[in-house]
C-alpha cells in the first residue's frame, strides 16, 4: 500500500508455498484479499512477489500474465517489488545453503533475474519504480580455499550482474520503468555487512561497470556511474544487519557517504540472548535456542565476544559450542514475527526494526518496505496463527511504528 510519505509497504509472498505459478497464484488468491481487507480496505494494496524460476517461466506466458494482471486490477492490487533471492524450492524441502543455488557465478542466475525484471516491467503501475532483491553473489563458505579464488568469484559475479544492469538501462532508455537490483547481504554470503557491500561496490562494481556501460551505450564515465548507482542498490534486511551487530545509523551513514541507495527495506527480526556465565542459566538459554533448531533453513549464529565476533554456519554448530566461556551473546538467523519482542528467555532484534523505522519516518531513505517473515511454517506451535491474521498483524505493527496512514 502507498503511505503518506509516498513509500510503499507490503509483505513478501515467499511466506506462501507453491513453486509452480499455478500453485503460488492459488495461495495469493486465498490470502491477499483477506490481508488487503484488514490493512488497506479502501486503497490499492501492493504485493511483494516471490517467484521461483519455474513460476517465472510459467508466468512469462502471455495467457498467464494477462490473467494475473486482470486479477490484480479486480482486487485493486499492484506489484512493485519482487524477491529474486531463492531460485528453487523454498518450502517443504531442505533449503539450507542451497538458497544461494544457482549463485551469481552462473548464467542461470542471470537469465532468471532478467526474466523477473521483464515481468516486473509488465506489472508495474505507470510511473512507479520497481526493485528486485537478490543473493549477495554467492555463499562464502563455498570459496574459502584462497584469496585469489574469492577475487575470481567477485569478478565473475560482478560481470554477470552487469549483464542485468545493461538490460535495466535499456528498458529505461526505451521508455520503460526505472528498476533496481537490490543486493541483500546476509551472514556467510560473499557480502555480510555494510563494509563488504561497499568494498564490492567501490572496488568491483564501479571499476568494472563504468567502462562496460561506456562501451555499451556510448555514455560518459559520470553517466555510467550514475546509472549503476540508480540500478544497483542495497536491500537492507534488518534481521541480517542486526545479526552482525550493525546499527541502522551506521548502515545509512556509510551509504550516504558514498552516494549509494537503499532500494528495499526488508523488515524482519532475528533471535538473540545474552549468554550468562552461570552454567544453569546459560543452559536454559541454550535449551530455548534448541527449540528453534529445524532442518529447513540456515540459522546462522553470530556470537559476540569481548574481542570480536564468532561465526557459526548453522545453529547445530553453535549448540555444540554452547559452553564457550568467551561468548557473551548469541544472535541467530530466524525470521521471527516482528510484533513479538520476547520468546521466553530469548528476545528478538525488534528494537533494530524500531530504530530503522524511526529513521525512515524522520527522513525517508527508501520507497520500498517489505515485511519478510517466511518461517511461519517451521515456528514452534504456540507462535502459529492463521496466515492472513499473522501477516495483517505484522503490517499493522509496522504502520504503528511509522505513524503513517495509507494514502
Regions found by a protein language model. Name each.
Residues 1-127, 131, 163, 228-235, ...:
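N-terminal pre-domain/capping segments
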Residues 14-16, 50-54, 84-87, 135-139, ...:
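Active-site beta-loop-alpha junctions enriched in small/polar residues
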Residues 24-33, 61-68, 151-167, 198-208, ...:
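Well-ordered, non-membrane alpha-helical segments in soluble/globular domains
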Residues 57-61, 92, 142-144, 192-196, ...:
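A short acidic (Asp/Glu
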Residues 73-76, 256, 334, 361:
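Anion (oxyanion) recognition and catalysis
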Residues 93-233, 243:
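Active-site acidic/histidine proton-transfer and metal-coordination neighborhood
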Residues 171-319, 327, 336:
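Acidic/histidine-rich catalytic cores of soluble enzymes
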Residues 261, 304-406:
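Flexible, acidic glycine-rich loops studded with aromatic residues
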Amino acid at each position: 500500500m502507498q503511505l503518506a510519505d509516498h513509500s510503499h509497504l507490503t509483505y513478501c509472498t515467499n511466506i506462501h508455498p507453491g513453486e509452480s505459478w499455478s500453485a503460488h497464484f492459488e495461495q495469493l488468491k486465498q490470502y491477499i484479499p483477506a490481508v488487503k481487507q484488514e490493512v488497506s480496505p479502501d486503497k490499492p494494496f501492493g504485493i511483494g512477489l516471490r517467484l521461483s524460476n519455474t513460476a517465472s517461466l510459467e508466468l512469462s506466458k502471455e495467457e498467464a500474465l494477462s490473467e494475473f494482471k486482470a486479477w490484480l486490477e479486480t482486487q485493486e492490487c499492484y506489484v512493485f517489488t519482487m524477491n529474486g533471492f531463492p531460485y528453487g524450492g523454498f518450502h517443504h524441502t531442505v533449503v539450507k545453503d542451497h538458497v544461494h543455488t544457482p549463485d551469481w557465478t552462473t548464467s542461470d542466475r542471470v537469465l532468471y533475474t532478467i526474466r523477473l525484471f521483464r515481468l516486473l516491467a509488465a506489472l508495474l503501475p505507470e510511473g512507479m519504480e520497481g526493485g528486485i532483491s537478490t543473493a549477495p553473489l554467492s555463499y562464502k563458505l563455498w570459496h574459502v580455499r584462497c584469496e585469489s579464488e574469492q577475487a575470481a568469484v567477485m569478478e565473475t559475479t560482478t560481470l554477470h550482474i552487469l549483464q542485468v544492469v545493461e538490460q535495466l538501462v535499456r528498458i529505461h532508455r526505451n521508455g520503460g520503468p526505472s528498476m533496481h537490483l537490490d543486493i541483500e547481504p546476509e551472514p556467510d554470503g560473499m557480502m555480510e555487512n555494510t563494509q563488504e557491500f561497499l568494498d564490492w561496490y567501490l572496488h568491483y562494481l564501479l571499476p568494472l561497470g563504468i567502462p562496460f556501460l561506456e562501451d555499451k551505450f556510448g555514455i560518459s564515465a559520470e553517466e555510467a556511474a550514475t546509472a549503476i548507482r540508480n540500478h544497483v542498490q542495497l536491500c537492507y534486511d534488518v534481521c541480517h544487519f542486526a545479526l552482525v551487530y550493525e546499527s541502522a545509523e551506521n548502515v545509512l551513514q556509510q551509504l550516504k557517504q558514498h552516494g549509494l541507495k537503499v532500494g528495499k527495506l526488508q523488515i524482519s527480526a532475528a533471535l538473540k540472548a545474552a549468554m550468562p556465565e552461570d552454567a544453569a542459566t546459560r543452559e536454559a538459554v541454550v535449551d530455548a535456542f534448541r527449540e528453534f533448531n529445524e532442518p529447513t533453513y540456515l540459522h546462522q549464529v553470530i556470537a559476540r565476544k569481548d574481542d570480536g565476533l564468532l561465526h557459526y554456519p548453522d545453529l547445530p554448530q553453535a549448540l555444540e559450542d554452547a559452553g564457550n566461556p568467551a561468548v557473551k551473546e548469541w544472535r541467530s538467523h530466524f525470521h521471527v514475527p516482528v510484533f513479538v519482542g520476547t520468546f521466553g528467555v530469548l528476545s528478538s532484534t525488534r528494537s533494530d526494526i524500531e530504530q530503522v523505522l524511526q529513521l525512515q519516518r524522520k527522513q525517508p531513505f527508501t520507497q520500498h518496505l517489505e515485511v519478510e517473515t517466511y518461517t511461519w511454517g517451521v515456528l514452534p506451535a504456540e507462535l502459529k496463527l492463521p496466515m492472513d491474521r499473522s501477516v495483517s498483524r505484522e503490517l499493522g505493527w509496522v504502520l504503528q511504528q511509522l505513524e503513517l496512514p495509507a494514502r
